[in-house]
Amino acid sequence: MPRKKSINKRDVLPDVFYNSKLVTKTINTIMKDGKKATAQAILYGAFNKVKEITQREPIIVFDEALKNIMPELEVRSRRIGGQKYQIPSEVRPERKQSLGLRWLVQFAQKRNEKTMQQKLAKEIIDAASGNGLAVKKREEIHRMAEANKSFAHYRW
């Protein structure tokens, strides 16, 4: 138990182009070694490519993609009577968002396109249409939770 009161979460500022906190969080997820300008260039370039390909507003396509990626359930390990059980549990809203963004960037990096902008744009478009590796990861997590539904009564 912590002796002091719990620490308040820091609020991120919305980005300048889309006035969205979600875009800022995505930039922070993409960022490596504190290179925020590079991360911004990657994301805004990816959004331009999304607009070229889909002829739709990129922020709307991005929101659709994130909704398709964010997990509703996950499994957590819990030790009961000397055995470990995979217990399905609901995912908190903040964790849903951070997992979705993390998976989007992670699976975009694994794609075969030339630049990171192209990789991210393709992954966003695929996720918005319900395909893509990030959506497969979510479905895999949901399948694991469904398979271990019998242990749900161990939830804490």
Swiss-Prot record:
InterPro entries: Ribosomal_uS7 (IPR000235), Ribosomal_uS7_bac/org-type (IPR005717), Ribosomal_uS7_CS (IPR020606), Ribosomal_uS7_dom (IPR023798), Ribosomal_uS7_dom_sf (IPR036823). Pfam families: Ribosomal_S7. PROSITE patterns: RIBOSOMAL_S7. GO terms for molecular function: rRNA binding; structural constituent of ribosome; tRNA binding. Keywords: Ribonucleoprotein, Ribosomal protein, RNA-binding, rRNA-binding, tRNA-binding. One of its GO terms (biological process) is translation. One of its GO terms (cellular component) is small ribosomal subunit. Gene3D superfamilies: Ribosomal protein S7 domain. NCBIfam families: rpsG_bact (TIGR01029). One of the primary rRNA binding proteins, it binds directly to 16S rRNA where it nucleates assembly of the head domain of the 30S subunit. Is located at the subunit interface close to the decoding center, probably blocks exit of the E-site tRNA. PANTHER family: RIBOSOMAL PROTEIN S7 (PTHR11205). This is Small ribosomal subunit protein uS7. The lineage of its organism: Bacteria, Bacillati, Mycoplasmatota, Mollicutes, Acholeplasmatales. The gene is rpsG.
